[in-house]
From Swiss-Prot:
Keywords: Antiport, Cell inner membrane, Cell membrane, Ion transport, Membrane, Sodium, Sodium transport, Transmembrane, Transmembrane helix, Transport. The gene is nhaB. It comes from the Bacteria. It comes from Pseudomonas putida (strain ATCC 700007 / DSM 6899 / JCM 31910 / BCRC 17059 / LMG 24140 / F1). This is Na(+)/H(+) antiporter NhaB. Na(+)/H(+) antiporter that extrudes sodium in exchange for external protons.
Length: 500
């Protein structure tokens, strides 16, 4: 009986995660008290930071909230920080929590409009280079005002929908009836080459779209959660943030869009595959049937969502309220005028954001430990001993390398908090502080496209339903992101070092 209970407990601990991963987390939990008792709080604090970064890097094995949360509960019990310090950290960053709670949910109710736009572009543009550029531009524009995860989710939804239609037709099934999309056994030999080509076509479009969210997300206060966090620390509103980061973000945006076109024209790194004509004919016929069947209520819903999007952009530009409250307004407007009054339908809009919001609380708990143990103070002090003109570039590199393997919100939180403390201590001027803030913001946003771990949108794409269908693996994502990483990361460093 005891063996079965032990086995059940071991199986339930962290669920379907590999046994080696469970063993590593248990080792961390045993190691931390020993380090605290033998070497001291600084060593235990650094161990905690490294362990938490490990959980972020292994996000595909287990969502970091559970293992990271266990580590932080232990840190609280070991008094490496206090519940009061965590509460004050959350209170200080409350606008970011509001953003994730309400803005992401608000954009959820615009999905039909966004899906309509991406579908029209996909079928209306025949040039692959122009189509890729439009996907990248639209993703960048939407991510500058909306939420990158939601924009990525919409692109994925469009891709899954189109893939499902053609896969069913190629399998001899009704395109409007459910079928197994993960098996090619029923696909006629005649259609197999076209299906594989269509997969490569969708892979390239999805990667362009995901990179577009990073290109646009770095530009504005609401583009990424860490932007709002940094803007809040600096006292910047929407227009302030846009102008401060423009010397870096605008050149990088232009270079990223140029890279998109060149990759398609030169057919490098897995890009350049065209949509087979047979696939286009099937999808166009399906879309025409959908248009004919669209009801008046559905058309009105699209207009309401479009008007709400316009109001959202105006309110953000004028900073009429905190970003999260504007998101709540969008929820009220769209649901009130489209007849969404059921509590369960409302609740689904919050499902995507709440896990990450909970994880963000764990981020801030780690930051509270870092503050209490002063872990990053020596590093920041060393950077500040460098000549002033070298400091932005060095911070950019430090942020970029860590953001590529960890979560950029976590990295940005650590660095902006430590640099602000140095500013408050009189170690730099306000102008130099703003320069370093831009370096931290761009350093966490641009080089982090190198791996799926760095960008939430990339990780979301990798773990989505479409990834196995179109054969998009971790390694393939890294390979396809490589040219963007070099261009965006390299030009970003140059701009931070020489143009700020």
């Amino acid at each position: 009986m005891s063996r079965s209970l032990t086995g059940a407990l071991a199986h339930g601990f962290l669920g379907q995660s590999p046994l080696w991963y469970k063993a590593v987390i248990c080792l961390f939990l045993v190691l931390n008290p020993l380090l605290l008792a033998t070497i001291g709080p600084a060593a235990a604090g650094w161990a905690l930071v490294i362990e938490f970064i490990f959980t972020l890097g292994m996000a595909l094995k287990c969502y970091p909230l559970m293992p990271g949360g266990l580590l932080l509960i232990e840190a609280l019990l070991l008094q490496m920080t206090t519940p009061q310090a965590l509460y004050e950290e959350l209170q200080h960053n409350f606008p970011v929590i509001l953003l994730l709670m309400f803005m992401v949910a608000g954009i959820h109710f615009m999905k039909e409009l966004l899906l309509f736009l991406f579908s029209r572009i996909l079928l209306g543009v025949r040039s692959k280079a122009m189509l890729s550029l439009l996907f990248c531009v639209l993703s960048a524009f939407l991510s500058a005002f909306l939420d990158a995860l939601t924009v990525t989710a919409v692109i994925i939804s469009a891709a899954v929908g189109f893939y499902a239609v053609y896969h069913r037709v190629a399998s001899g099934a009704n395109p409007r009836e459910d079928s197994a999309l993960d098996s090619d056994q029923q696909v006629a030999q005649l259609h197999r080459d076209d299906l594989n080509q269509f997969r490569a076509f969708l892979r390239s479009l999805l990667m362009h779209g995901a990179v577009g969210t990073a290109l646009g997300g770095v530009c504005t206060l609401v583009g990424e959660p860490q932007n709002l966090l940094i803007g809040h620390e600096m006292g910047w509103h929407f227009a302030d943030f846009l102008l401060k980061v423009a010397p870096v973000s605008i050149p990088v945006l232009g270079a990223g869009l140029l890279t998109c076109v060149l990759l398609e024209k030169l057919r490098l790194f897995g890009y350049g595959t065209l949509m087979p004509e047979t696939v286009r004919q099937v999808l166009a016929a399906y879309a025409a049937e959908d248009d004919a069947a669209r009801t008046q209520a559905q058309r009105i819903a699209l207009w309401v969502q479009g008007l709400a999007a316009l109001i959202l952009i105006i309110c953000l530009g004028l900073h009429v309220a905190e970003v999260g409250l504007i998101g709540l307004m969008v929820i009220v407007l769209i649901t009130a005028f489209t007849g969404i009054t059921d509590e369960h339908r409302l609740g689904r809009a919050f499902q995507d954001a709440m896990p990450f919001t909970s994880l963000l609380v764990v981020f801030f708990a780690v930051v509270a430990v870092i503050h209490q143990q002063q872990l990053f103070s020596p590093l920041i002090s060393w950077v500040l001993t460098l000549p002033a003109e070298q400091q932005p570039g060095m911070l950019y590199l430090a942020n970029g390398l860590l953001s590529a393997i960890s979560d950029n919100v976590f990295v940005a939180t650590i660095y902006i908090t430590e640099v602000k403390q140095a500013f408050l201590n009189g170690s730099m001027s306000r102008e130099h502080f703003e320069t370093l803030a831009v370096a931290i913001n761009t350093g966490t946003n641009l080089p982090s496209v190198a791996t799926p771990n760095g960008q939430a949108a990339f990780l979301f794409l990798l773990t989505s339903a479409i990834a196995p269908l179109i054969r998009l693996s971790y390694g393939r994502m890294v390979w396809m992101a490589l040219p963007y990483t070099v261009v965006m990361g390299g030009l970003g460093w140059w701009a931070v070092t020489y143009w700020l």
